[in-house]
UniProtKB/Swiss-Prot annotation:
It catalyses: N(6)-[(R)-lipoyl]-L-lysyl-[protein] + 2-oxoglutarate + H(+) = N(6)-[(R)-S(8)-succinyldihydrolipoyl]-L-lysyl-[protein] + CO2. This is 2-oxoglutarate dehydrogenase E1 component. Keywords: Glycolysis, Oxidoreductase, Thiamine pyrophosphate. GO terms for molecular function: oxoglutarate dehydrogenase (succinyl-transferring) activity; thiamine pyrophosphate binding. PANTHER family: 2-OXOADIPATE DEHYDROGENASE COMPLEX COMPONENT E1, 2-OXOGLUTARATE DEHYDROGENASE. The keyword Thylakoid does not apply. E1 component of the 2-oxoglutarate dehydrogenase (OGDH) complex which catalyzes the decarboxylation of 2-oxoglutarate, the first step in the conversion of 2-oxoglutarate to succinyl-CoA and CO(2). Its EC number is 1.2.4.2. Transmembrane segments: none annotated. One of its GO terms (cellular component) is oxoglutarate dehydrogenase complex. InterPro entries: 2oxoglutarate_DH_E1, 2oxoglutarate_DH_E1_bac, DH_E1, KGD_C_sf, ODO-1/KGD_C, THDP-binding, Transketolase-like_Pyr-bd. Its cofactor is thiamine diphosphate.
Length: 932
């Protein structure tokens, strides 16, 4: 007889109120085993010949609905579902539970003798081979579910996942650490706590955001990375806030003590950077506080050569989560091939460390977890660790959340949650083991709630007893985990008392030696760094030329589909018009076609493209059609996967209805794979401000703070077209306010060919010192405007132009109008109806860096110029006016009059009524074109 058993779903184990049905099914099973589901066959086979079970089942008839077996099943079900409420997971200050479900044998009118007469198989199908009876099995369950790890998994909908977790948790298993491993674990804790104690003593009051109280985080990370190494995962991406960050840097990424202590002493830490190049640390010219900085360590300390990255992070809690997910996905994707990328979730894994107050408090966590199983964003399962010190600055849980646990919000994503006592180090290791096994099996997220405390205040200058006096009376008396575990090992005979204290002192000795080296080092005379020379210049134009035949070959390939592929007739007519620029003299390339041609040539150059956003496959305004759908079968076809001589991948995904997490993901992806042309497209530019934290704290400042380069491109539909205040403005002014030190390029274009050349220039800058973010105020109605569309000869040569003008007679021009984007096109079309040679329209295609030299050179050619006007659609306090005014004021000096035409100052971006919009828009154009 074999001991192998098939998985049993949760339902048969928890039949409870369905007991009558189960009895009927059992009778059917006795007549014909194949007449019941397979999982019930397994369960019923364990009790078929058991004299204690069958009579017990039969005794629970409709006349005795509260019979013995039903009560046993209710007890078992309660232990599984609610045992966590009585688990030993609080090192100090356990909460007082007001309402705890029945969890004891006596609560169900059961006793030892009754349970000893029932098969263990009724508790769990695999227990029949392990325990003699239900009493022994229930004792095991009580110990398991009420121990130092509290398990929550019954909320998971997937039967297979629930069954796997049930079996893994309930099967007798204990992390077996031999004496050497226990000794090593103690040493890890001694280093963790010794580091904190040394800093606390020698740098009194200095902010370090101590890990003390959740010290086990470091051995948990070390265990995770070791398991990952055994699985062949060679890229680890970690994201965390400031709490415990310095300890993780020193003991997980192996940043030398000398470097860390140097930062406290304001000396140059780079003098102690390992010469072997194994530790990569970047820095910007303005810098950041030490507990925001990350790094990358290449090491074989965990069993195989691995790349361990800790992401740079601002003080904005949790916002790094999607960045880490994006970095992980980039490490998993193979983009150096034609077609779509292939994703290997085995290449890399993300570890995201949260705070207990911030995890339920910050919505970015829910946006990020929602990405977990999506085709374009999945990373094969993230390990989430909550460093739960049960306080947020001064705020206690009762004021921080509306749920029992900070992790309750994760239940909606069908992931297992393990709460573990931070003082039981061996239990924390077991929690990691189970989590990593589950991730490997199901490629899904796991949440571990590391329940501890905070030894000191929010920072080391803070006095927590002012606001939290009672908890801190107990915390001050509570022994550290280093001491708790050390004494346990002494009692077990693993180490002696002298060995314990000797090793603690050895750690302090190593830290003193490191400190002594720094005392001899020179103070930093000038800590300021200079910007890279490449950033002194704007984005450089890509001057590569193309033959007509080359672009035609690409265009033909993009308009060729598989045999039998049925495109909607209405759409096919639109796509067929893309042949016209190549076979008609008056054929023009519109915006969407210009983009397709640019993308194709970029792919031929070997640069992968990733484009995401809400509705990006089709395009919000039904212009792109990058992914085609067979109208009969629903199958899809992506022409940009089939470009002739394609050397890199094209990846496009409709994103979930999220901005912050999706933009953070794309930023992280591009930081990890700097060769990738990452583009995020807003559904409307108005919604981009949902990602403001990513813009402010990462995209536009990361290089200045951290030396972290990104070339992420933003497509933000922007134009005033009578659609109201929430569908008109991408808040151009905010991006221009963020622009400084050549940290980005901001454009608002009026020409499809200039768009083509811009995209190529941005792609060419990637993975170079030139790379920087690109912000495109992309068009809406202009997508189909013939004035914007250009002939093919403007694509075969030339490059991006920061300003554009029409032909003009210099001596006749008395007025220059500077405008951008749709405003320029509106003015151009109005002027075409009433030509006036005295007015010269100038399209400012690139707003930042502002094209001063180009405008100055143009104005110098106009001998009779009298007036320069800036014209915009936006209100005066918005748009580009306040940004361009200082530049233009210098250019006109006292030589010309300077005027503004646009909407007056407004609190909201645009009018809500379409007719009023037209009146205001027409008035702006009329006044601007008047020649005084």
């Amino acid at each position: 007889m074999t001991n192998e058993r098939k998985e049993v779903s949760e339902a048969p184990v928890n039949f409870g109120a369905n007991l009558g049905l189960m009895l009927d099914l059992y009778d059917d099973f006795l007549q014909d085993p194949s007449s019941v589901p397979e999982d019930l066959q397994v369960l019923f086979s364990t009790i078929k010949n058991d004299d204690s079970i069958v009579p017990a089942l039969k005794s629970t008839s409709s006349q005795n609905s509260d019979g013995t077996i039903k009560r046993v099943m209710r007890l078992i079900d309660n232990i599984r579902q609610y045992g966590h409420l009585k688990a030993d997971i609080y090192p100090v200050n356990p909460p007082k539970r007001k309402h705890v479900p029945k969890l004891e044998i006596e609560d169900f009118d059961l006793d030892q003798q009754t349970l000893e007469g029932i098969s263990a198989g009724i508790v769990s199908d695999h227990f029949a081979d392990i325990y003699d009876n239900a009493y022994e099995a229930i004792l095991r369950m009580e110990k398991r579910y009420k121990g130092p790890i509290a398990f929550e998994y019954t909320h998971i909908n997937n039967n297979t996942e629930r069954g796997w977790l049930k079996r893994r948790i309930e099967t007798p298993y204990k992390v077996t650490l031999n004496n050497n491993e226990k000794r090593a674990l103690f040493k890890q804790l001694a280093y963790v706590e010794g580091f904190e104690k040394y800093l606390h003593k020698n740098f009194v009051g200095a902010k370090r955001f101590s890990i003390e109280g959740v010290d086990a985080l470091v051995p948990m990370l070390q265990r995770t990375i070791t398991i990952a190494a055994k699985e062949g995962i060679k890229n680890i991406q970690i994201g965390m806030a400031h709490r415990g960050r310095l300890n993780v840097l020193t003991h997980v990424l192996e940043k030398p003590y000398e470097m860390m202590i140097s930062e406290f002493m304001h000396t140059d830490p780079m003098k102690f950077l390992p010469e072997d190049g194994s530790l990569q640390l970047t820095a910007g010219w303005t810098g950041d506080v030490k507990y925001h900085l990350g790094g990358i360590k290449t090491t074989d300390s965990y069993g195989t050569m691995q790349r361990i990255a800790l992401a740079n992070n601002p003080s904005h809690l949790e916002i790094v989560a999607p960045v880490v997910e994006g970095r992980t996905r980039a490490a998993q994707d193979d983009t150096q091939r034609a077609g779509a990328p292939t994703t290997d979730h085995h290449k890399a894994m993300p570890i995201i460390i949260h705070g207990d107050a911030a995890y339920p408090g910050q919505g970015i966590n829910f946006e990020t977890m929602n990405l977990g199983n999506l085709k374009g964003y999945s990373t094969g399962g993230s390990l989430h660790i909550i460093t739960n010190n049960r306080i947020g600055f001064t705020t206690e849980p009762i004021d921080a959340r509306s749920t029992t646990y900070s992790t309750d919000v994760a239940k909606g994503y069908d992931v297992p949650i393990f709460h573990v006592n931070a003082d039981d180090v061996e239990a924390t290791i077991e929690a990691i083991d189970i989590a990593m096994e589950f991730r490997k099996e199901f490629h899904k997220d796991v949440v571990i709630d590391l329940v501890g405390y905070r030894r000191f205040g929010h920072n080391e200058m803070d006095e927590p007893s002012i606001t939290n006096p009672v908890p801190y009376q107990n915390i001050r008396k509570h022994d550290s985990v280093e001491y708790v575990f050390g004494k346990k090992l002494v009692n077990e005979g693993v180490i002696s008392e002298d060995e314990m204290h000797s090793f603690i002192e050895q750690v302090q000795k190593e830290l003193r030696q490191a400190h002594d080296k720094i005392n001899k080092a020179d103070k930093m005379d000038n800590p300021d760094m200079e910007k890279p020379a490449e950033l002194a210049l704007p984005l450089q134009a890509d001057e590569q030329s193309f033959t007509f035949d080359h672009l035609k070959e690409i265009n033909d390939a993009l308009l060729t589909y598989p045999d039998g592929f049925n495109i909607l007739k209405k759409l096919n007519k639109v796509l067929e018009k893309r042949h016209e620029p190549f076979n008609k003299e008056d054929g023009l390339v519109d915006w969407a076609q210009a983009e397709q041609l640019a993308f194709a040539t970029i792919l031929q150059d070997g640069t992968p493209i990733r484009l995401t956003g809400q509705d990006s496959e089709r395009g919000t305004f039904s212009h792109r059609h990058a992914v085609l759908h067979d109208e009969q079968t629903g199958e899809t076809y992506t022409p940009l996967h089939h470009v002739p001589d394609q050397k890199a991948t094209f990846d496009i995904h409709n994103s979930p209805l999220s901005e912050a997490a999706v933009v953070g993901f794309e930023y992280g992806y591009n930081v990890e794979n700097k060769k990738s042309f990452n583009i995020w497209e807003a559904q409307y530019g108005d919604f981009a401000n949902m990602s403001q934290m990513i813009f402010d704290n990462f995209l536009f400042s990361s290089r200045s703070k951290w030396g972290e380069r990104s070339g992420l491109t933003l497509f933000l539909p922007h134009a005033y077209e009578g659609q109201g205040p929430e569908h008109s403005s991408a808040r151009l002014e905010r991006f221009l306010q963020l622009a400084a030190e050549n940290n980005c390029t901001v454009v608002n274009l009026s020409s499809s060919s200039n768009y083509f050349h811009l995209l190529r220039a941005q792609a060419a800058s990637l993975d170079s010192e030139q790379m920087r973010p690109l912000v495109v105020m992309s068009p809406k109605s202009l997508l189909r405007n013939k004035t914007v569309a250009k002939p093919i000869d403007e694509f075969t040569s030339g490059g991006f132009e920061p300003i554009l003008t029409e032909s003009y007679q210099a001596d006749k021009v008395t007025k220059v109008i500077l405008a951008t984007g749709k405003m320029f096109i509106d003015l151009k079309e109005a002027l075409a109806k009433n030509p006036d040679e005295s007015v010269l329209l100038v399209a400012i295609e690139r707003l930042y860096p502002f094209p001063e030299e180009e405008i100055e050179a143009l104005l110098a050619q106009l001998p009779n110029l009298e007036e320069v006007s800036w014209v915009q659609e936006e209100p005066k306090n918005q748009g580009a006016w306040l940004y361009v005014y200082p530049y233009v004021k210098v250019l006109v000096a006292d030589k010309y009059d300077l005027s503004y035409h646009g909407r007056i100052q407004r609190a909201a971006p645009a009018e809500g009524d379409g007719e009023i919009h037209k009146l205001v828009q027409n008035k702006i154009i009329e006044n601007a074109l008047k020649n005084n």
